[in-house]
Amino acid sequence: MITGRTALYGVVGHPVAHSRSPEMQNAAFAKLGVDAAYVALPVAPERIDEALRGAHALGFQGLNVTVPHKPRAASLCHALDPVATAVGAANTLRRTRDGWEGFNTDAPACRTLLEAAGVARGARALLVGAGGAARAAAWALLQLGTELRVAARREEAAAELCRDLAAAVPGADAATADFEDLEAEADAAAVVVNGTSVELPGHEGRLPPLRFRADQVVLDFVYGDTELARAARAGGARLVTGEQVLVRQGALAFTIWTGLPAPEADMARALEAREGAR
């Protein structure tokens, strides 16, 4: 039951109705008996500045930030953790007296999951996209010592990502790749990461059909039965799903907000229950 003492949290994005974070985080609060509620907050890109000020004024204790607001959210925080600083994007905000403190939990979540999938130092990695999620994945891949190649529809955005992350990660090997020849770039890579928002509700465009092999690792930030996930399974690749990324980053965010170990298994079950109800 929501009362006058219930702590408020939410996720801001555009669009955001598809987000599974409310089910996941509310399940975590319920499991641990935390008096809190988490809601989805649709915010158009041109209103993100006033939305974050308003959420702070309304007493929200923490926020998640999703497409397309992560880079802008980082610039609006009065303090950033080292990973958010390096990545240039924040997906988790914690309330302070002076405003918002920004964190990036996407990046360590990706690193943990990619490492568990067997990504090896020196492996060639193809990252598709150059937005906030892609920046987090780039940090993770460079931390793992991969040879990173970034392909984006806007080549200048891919080049900027490479420059920023190379400066932030000592010894980084990062360069752009040819988006127009994505099939060949993916075939040459041991690791392929989709950091774009294609196949999200409200987002147009598709990646070209890609084929994968059993010796490849594929990570898709978009959750659900995506074309990329189906292709990875068909080829026998080791697949890291968007759901896995969502749960891991969400668990890290939960701990940042509450100081409590996140009930990660319960959070994952909440996602599965929603998927089963669709």
Swiss-Prot record:
It holds the Pfam family SDH_C. Keywords: Amino-acid biosynthesis, Aromatic amino acid biosynthesis, NADP, Oxidoreductase. Shikimate binds at S19, R20, S21, T66, N91, D106, Y223. NADP(+) binds at G129, A130, G131, G132, A133, F221, G242. The keyword Electron transport does not apply. One of its GO terms (biological process) is aromatic amino acid family biosynthetic process. The keyword Amino-acid biosynthesis applies. SUPFAM superfamilies: Aminoacid dehydrogenase-like, N-terminal domain, NAD(P)-binding Rossmann-fold domains. One of its GO terms (molecular function) is shikimate 3-dehydrogenase (NADP+) activity. InterPro entries: Aminoacid_DH-like_N_sf, NAD(P)-bd_dom_sf, SDH_C, Shikimate_DH-bd_N, Shikimate_DH_fam. It catalyses: shikimate + NADP(+) = 3-dehydroshikimate + NADPH + H(+). It comes from the Bacteria. The active site is at K70. Pathway: Metabolic intermediate biosynthesis; chorismate biosynthesis; chorismate from D-erythrose 4-phosphate and phosphoenolpyruvate: step 4/7. Its EC number is 1.1.1.25. Belongs to the shikimate dehydrogenase family. Homodimer. Involved in the biosynthesis of the chorismate, which leads to the biosynthesis of aromatic amino acids. Catalyzes the reversible NADPH linked reduction of 3-dehydroshikimate (DHSA) to yield shikimate (SA). This is Shikimate dehydrogenase (NADP(+)). It comes from Anaeromyxobacter dehalogenans (strain 2CP-C). The gene is aroE.
